[in-house]
Amino acid sequence: MIQLNNGIRIFVNHSMKKDIYIGISDFGFEKDINDGILGIAHLLEHILISFDNKYFNANASTSRTYMSFWCVALQKRHYEDAIRTAISWFFDKKYILKTDFSRIVLENYITELENEYYYRTEMYHCMDVLAYLYGGDLYNGGRITMLERLPEIRNMLSNRMKFLSGKNIVIFVKRLTNNILTLLTNTFGSIPKYPIIIPLDPQIQDARRKIIMMPCPFYTLLIQVDNTMNNLLAIICLVENYNLIDYETISDKLYVCISFANEDQYEYLLYNIKDMDFNINRIELDLGEDYIMNLYINFPWLKNDIFEYIHTMNTKSAMLLADLKKNMHNSILEHKFMIIYPSFTKLLYNITDKQNHGILVVGDVSFTPEKDPSMHHSNKENNNNYSKTVTKRKSKYVMYRKTPTTNNIVIDYTDSSFFDYATFYHVMKSKYEKTNLFSRLKTSTGMCYKHCFDNDDLNELINSDTFIRYNSSKPAVLYQYILLAYFVTERDIKELVDYKDAIELDMKYYSKNKILFGKNTRYDIRTKSMFVCGLIKGRKLSEKVITDYMWKLKSLGLIYYLTSIKLGISNTFYIFAFTIFPEKVYNFFVGLKEITNRCLIVSNKNTKIEEDDYSSLNKQIVIGIK
């Protein structure tokens, strides 16, 4: 580790996939709460990051407490250019920190934020309970209503850059040369050690004794513990050895977060935490650079190299976990915990945020642990007579232990469980992206999922009642597969919709088919979502060209993400994009010279009835399969 004079820490990681990774603590959207406009942090992230996708790949993220950015060159010879690109996001050509946003066209960025909101709510249920209970909203990424306050927002963006301080910045680089160290010193090293403008922290009180009913795939227990080094090390021990365990932070609060498929599992842990046996294998901190970076920026008091603590975690894990269990037990006795219950009834809510998202929050719930964990326990909710019997279970059935080696499961597109695994992957990606619990690799006939779940545990989770209901609550995930199957098979739309669990998507098999484009190039349907999808064909089309289309559409504020699948048929791609501007996205593709043939479907929301209307899709006039 190298520490610059202003407190910035630089780590060299030769095995890192990224070329440069920048983390900024105390810079997330919780700072928006006192500013009065939620989404400033996320908007700033979108404005700052800019790169040429012909030479680089890059991304950024904003959470409650931090912001992070990374960049990697597509070719090794452009490594130093990747470093310069990342630096250019924060500094001008004279190496002066960017604080002037007067010439930025904010409208496109804000509409892109609205499209991201739409994408995330269509693909997942994006609700941040902690942020809401501590003064924010259930969604804090910014909405299109920000267009009404542009002058204020420009000033807030400028002030937000002045929140930056050296002591809160961590930088990972793959290789460190004299030139790169000089670059980093002349740019990031010029940031003050302490911020020019000291931000006000939100007034946060402990959220106690609450049950939150909201759309989620599993039961989740959040127990507040002391924000200390020993507790952090104990949590890392658990994360390396168990699935569906992580931590959550907001301001200086730390929560242990554990998810379960069944209600009696969380109840057992709630009443028996002191007796839980955690088996910890060797700790190697093999969690990837994302997780390691998040440790530094979620816990800015962590000043030493986290790898210095591997010996402590391996030799003193029993002591660390005993102290953590005691802390969790005391927090339960003091009611410093929350329970998230899966609920998918839109009409069942008693609280709405400023954006009219509704959830059911039951406060002052009474939990009284008894000495005998096998005894009956009564939980009385607010104004309700409600009791549950806690079943004493063996601890091995409560926690989902990681397997020592990575498991692979290949699911054919034609398999009836394909959509279950596809949705499970999306859930893991959205909730546990940094821990890399569940990754995928496309094959010619299906998906290969890599995971560290025991097969019985994985089956229990995917076939649990809560996950099945969650899966059914997000029809938007299925639209792209239903319409893909419509284009590449001989089956009509009604058959596909009625039997969506048996959709055949074997691209290798259907590459033998020849698709004939009809005279009409546009078909309008009405569903529960807004999107544009269909087939495009052209000799000059490639995955790289379509990626360029995505970035152009994003820069115009028209979409957040564009999915594309290359078909076996020559020069033909299937595309799909959720958007709040379906007409504009359709017109964008119509105007592209590289596309010589197209058949696009434009979906608008069906406001009259709940049923989807595919009546315009007559197989004989849309396309021909030979």
Curated annotation (Swiss-Prot):
Its cofactor is Zn(2+). Pfam families: Peptidase_M44. It is an enzyme of class 3 (hydrolase). GO terms for biological process: proteolysis; viral life cycle. GO terms for molecular function: metalloendopeptidase activity; zinc ion binding. Binds 1 zinc ion. SUPFAM superfamilies: LuxS/MPP-like metallohydrolase. The active site is at E45. Its EC number is 3.4.24.-. Signal peptide: none annotated. Zn(2+) binds at H42, H46. Keywords: Hydrolase, Metal-binding, Metalloprotease, Protease, Zinc. Belongs to the peptidase M44 family. Seems to be involved in viral proteins maturation by cleavage at Ala-Gly-|-Xaa motifs. This is Probable metalloendopeptidase G1-type. It comes from Fowlpox virus (strain NVSL).
